[in-house]
Amino acid sequence: GRTFVCNSMPLDKFKAVSKGFGVTINDVFVSCVSGTLRRLLQDMHYDADRHALVGGVPFAGVRPEGWQGLGNFATVDYCWLHSEIEDPVERLAASHQSAAAMKEHLKASVEAGADLNALLQVCPPWLISVIRWYINRQRGALGFFGNAALSNVPGPREPIYINRYKLDSWFSTGQVFDGSSVNMTMWSYCGSANLCILADEKVIPDGWLVYDYFVKELDQLVALLPDTQQDPQQAVSAT
């Protein structure tokens, strides 16, 4: 079975941390995901300090000629989720480096036609079935999307209307894949950061615990903003 939860938090908190530490909003998101997973590992009595985890991040792919408008066309790359770093500020800096390295690797892979989507296009169906069988045998030790799938998508800044009806919130989710038990997807919309969590309920029976951990990680970074922004709440409201 699956557990699914979603809720909103102020996007200004992400902007304040981004501005205060000189990183991107996506870096803040990745760092908070890493801190959340660290808390979960500790709850499950694993050694969270042992090593980093691996996150799978989907990206929009370049459609071949004639494929315009035909469903989704995406690829994926991987980044380190530094759950092994206890200090939130150090983890944020490491997440910034991890995200930058992933972007460079993805660009080179796409240019060489060697990204995951391109490779799967040339794999025969029987080989993909064998890969899935092998991944399932590993019981979470290996997965197409690493240890967790995560996605941060910038959404509309202005309200969207369907006829005269205003869209109040924007929630979206990805999938959980073979070998990966949790997906954390965040959309921004009209000043809100909308976080959706989909998980294998055998591994994570309470999705709200994951959401609460994420909020705590974000609030911790806000509280640790540099001294030039003495009042975290003032820094958030001024952004």
At which residue positions do the language-model features occur?
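Gly/Ser/Thr-rich phosphate-binding loops and adjoining beta-strand/alpha-helix segments
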Residues: 1-60
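Flexible, Gly/Pro-enriched loop and linker segments at secondary-structure and domain junctions
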Residues: 1-7, 143-185
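Helical lid/core segments from catalytic subdomains that handle acyl or acyl-like groups
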Residues: 2-6, 67-156
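A generic structural motif
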Residues: 13, 21-22, 63-65, 80-86, ...
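Soluble, non-transmembrane catalytic domains of enzymes that act on hydrophobic metabolites at membranes
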Residues: 24-28, 36-45, 78, 86, ...
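Short strand-loop-helix active-site module centered on a catalytic nucleophile
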Residues: 28-29, 33, 95, 150, ...
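Small-residue-rich loop/turn and linker elements
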Residues: 45-69, 230-238
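Extended, hydrophobic beta-loop-alpha segments that form or line the acyl/peptidyl-thioester binding
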Residues: 178-233
